[in-house]
């Protein structure tokens, strides 16, 4: 450090100089609010808008018009005086604006009543200026407001389309009909919609199972989009009223439910495959290599089909 002085003295002097510099810097940037009378006269306590006052100066009040008789007596003076008075008035107004502080404060006090009277018009013009200054923002808002109803309509259109699914109704004569249903629709609703008046006669078969319970939903039966449901119309007839009781008894005997053919197809096919394999093992000379390969393929395919139907 410095010779002849201790370290503590040097540190203390450095801190004092630092604090003094900070204090001087703060005092140089400090401005007392409201202490200067000139600032108080320039900025009024009411609505402070000096830029608007200076940019829009109040025109000098015109002198009262002279009577018509005086103007008729002195036409030449009336023609010359207004020009000089207007020039003098404009020069005085410019000098007052540039130099006279009190005149500026007075005019600033005189302007607010006019603004209060036309306050609504100024607000409207200010709003129009804001909109003119930001046309991109206004355009974006309009596009957003137009896109909102379109998006809502798109959502309402997409929701029913997403909920619907197609189911193919296949009849015994190899004809098909496409049904538009929902997963929560029941078997009874499907029958009443596409077979009105024939609900009791129509039998629906899906994957070898008879859909006899009308309260079951399509979702609970694992019926998905583009599935095939086999439809069978039974020939059951209602007993007709006749005079003889014998004819009524015979008609009641013939009425009845047809046996479930779909449930018998799988056992019959299993028996047929078993017989073919029996003949293949005992009489090999009658089966060629392609016939054996095709028999193996049919057996494997049928095994996967049965496993898929009853494995769920």
From Swiss-Prot:
InterPro entries: TMUB1/2 (IPR040352), Ubiquitin-like_dom (IPR000626), Ubiquitin-like_domsf (IPR029071). The keyword Transmembrane helix applies. One of its GO terms (cellular component) is cytoplasm. One of its GO terms (biological process) is ERAD pathway. Keywords: Cytoplasm, Membrane, Nucleus, Transmembrane, Transmembrane helix. PROSITE patterns: UBIQUITIN_2. It is a multi-pass membrane protein. Residues 53-91, 108-161, 235-256 are annotated as: Disordered. May contribute to the regulation of translation during cell-cycle progression. May contribute to the regulation of cell proliferation. The membrane form is involved in sterol-regulated ubiquitination and degradation of HMG-CoA reductase HMGCR. May be involved in centrosome assembly. This is Transmembrane and ubiquitin-like domain-containing protein 1.
